[in-house]
Regions:
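Long extracytoplasmic/lumenal interhelical loops at the membrane interface
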Residues: 170-176, 322-396
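Alpha-helical transmembrane segments of multi-pass inner-membrane proteins
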Residues: 143-169, 181-244
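A membrane-periplasm/extracellular boundary helix in multi-pass inner-membrane enzymes
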Residues: 218-222, 243-324
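Hydrophobic transmembrane alpha-helices and their immediate junctions
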Residues: 147, 205, 249, 370, ...
Length: 469
């Protein structure tokens, strides 16, 4: 069985890391072996243990996870948690499913394996929504689930510290217990697990909790992530000041002082964010934000995204008239999203491939050179700039992207706390439209937000009952 190894990273270190992650997973499974939902969530957080043994084992893992989700759904009788007002979730899931299979069957070339692997994650999300709702609202397991997620977050921190001790440098691809290829989760994990910590501690952090938060930032640092250094401090500020509705008292001042410290440490610890391009370089505000703008919008910047459309041209050669395809050029992740909204608003002509996509192989089985030649109206400067929104456009088209947005965002309208609702939607919007879209594509990330959602709803319901008495 071929192992999935990164040949630019020391192989003995990768094997040592794999053993360490596997041991951590087994330990967590043993601690929570009596609860099927806990076992499911732990396994969903440890895909790299199985992906390490090749694509075949990875596909087996995905099948097992779907079956285990179905088993827990039946075993926990999660269907009883359904309420008529949640019919929108099922309706939009049905709409998304019809568009997904219509595109996969008639407009794109996909293998059954890749269709299953992509669609199963959305099925798991729907099942997990009702499983977690039943566990928290009807079975009273909210505190237990928060404790479990807290421990899983601690496991990610320990694994990241061990990784840095083994390699003595940032390794982007090996991200905690989740990823072997691609480190984008190094941005998402700190954000989601901060929300878990905030809810678990009721917004009251001790010194150890702030240390835990620094550990989450280290998860991103060890994977060489830059975005988390900007986004996490903003998320921390929003939760303590806006979501919590706290007046600016003594505790809030401590929080306000800690947020800039997070940003300061992030800039100095991340080589690409300081002029010296080294760990613990100098703090240069202009340099850091200049890099961030170029990262999001390319060298053209935000203003350069407005006049970048190649019009059709005719070429006469050998008695034959040929036409160059029109291309809407886009630089960076922000540029990709701007270009997509131009297409959706009808500012530029579209082709059939724009509306129905080119299939999952075109996104996930192409190298950078092949990606540049895809017959789409939008031409991205390079594949690494593809946001979650743009990936939906490539694979299932503009129609599929619209259905994805409607389905995946509909969950958050059931959050009763208005401030928390808009904050969660804002985080998901940034992550899908301006980053990689890993929240919607990773069932356990959706599960984390479902725990936050249902636990918060339960707390609000309990407060209302107490007030009525």
């Amino acid at each position: 069985m071929p192992l999935e190894l990164l040949y630019n990273v020391p192989i003995p270190g990768q094997i040592l890391m794999q053993v360490f992650v596997a041991v951590a997973m087994v330990y967590m499974l043993y601690r929570h072996r009596r609860d099927a939902l806990s076992v499911l969530l732990i396994l969903l957080c440890c895909p790299r243990v199985f992906l390490f043994f090749g694509s075949t084992m990875g596909n087996v893992y995905k099948v097992v996870m779907l079956l285990l989700c179905g088993y827990v759904f039946v075993q926990q009788r999660a269907a009883v948690a359904y309420q008529r007002k949640e019919g929108w979730i099922l309706l939009l899931f049905a709409l998304f499913s019809m568009e997904f299979f219509w595109t996969a069957a008639y407009y794109t070339q996909n293998t059954l394996t890749i269709i299953f692997s992509q669609y199963s994650r959305y099925v798991e999300a729907v099942l997990l929504y009702f499983i977690i709702k039943k566990a928290i609202v009807m079975d009273g397991k909210g505190d237990r689930l928060l404790r479990l997620l807290y421990e899983i977050g601690l496991m990610q921190i320990i694994i990241s510290v061990f990784k840095f001790a083994v390699f003595r440098e940032q390794v982007e691809s090996l991200c905690a217990s989740f990823s072997i290829y691609g480190g984008d989760m190094g941005t998402t994990i700190p954000i989601l697990w901060f929300i878990v910590l905030w809810l678990y501690r009721k917004g009251q952090f001790s010194k150890l909790d702030w240390l835990y938060l620094l550990g989450l930032l280290f998860v991103g640092f060890s994977s060489g992530k830059r975005a988390v250094m900007f986004i996490l401090p903003i998320v921390v500020f929003v939760f303590f000041v806006y979501v919590q509705g706290r007046k600016v008292g003594k505790y809030a001042l401590y929080v306000l002082a800690f947020v800039p410290l997070l940003f300061y440490l992030g800039v100095r610890l991340t080589p690409t964010l300081n002029p010296e391009n080294q760990v613990w370089g100098s703090f240069d505000w202009d340099y850091a934000f200049g890099y961030a703008e170029e990262y999001q919008f390319g060298k053209k910047g935000i203003d350069g995204q407005t006049a970048n459309f190649k019009t059709e041209q005719l070429q006469y050669s050998g008695g034959v008239i040929s036409t160059y395809n029109s291309k809407l050029e886009a630089d960076g992740r922000g540029g990709a999203t701007i270009a997509m909204f131009k297409l959706l608003l009808g500012m530029h002509p579209t082709a059939d491939s724009d509306w129905w996509g080119l299939g999952f192989n075109s996104m996930y089985s192409t190298d950078y050179a092949e990606f540049d030649k895809l017959p789409l109206t939008i031409q991205l400067n390079h594949k690494g700039s593809a946001t979650g929104f743009f990936q939906s456009y490539v694979t299932i088209g503009l129609a599929g992207a619209i259905c994805t947005v409607l389905f995946c965002f509909c969950f958050w309208f059931y959050i009763k706390n208005r401030r928390l609702r808009w904050t969660i939607m804002g985080i998901c919007a940034w992550e899908y439209f301006m980053y990689t879209g890993s929240i919607f594509r990773t069932p356990v990330f959706m599960a984390v937000l479902f725990v936050v959602m249902h636990y918060s709803n339960m707390e609000m319901q309990q407060k209302r009952r107490a007030q009525q008495r």
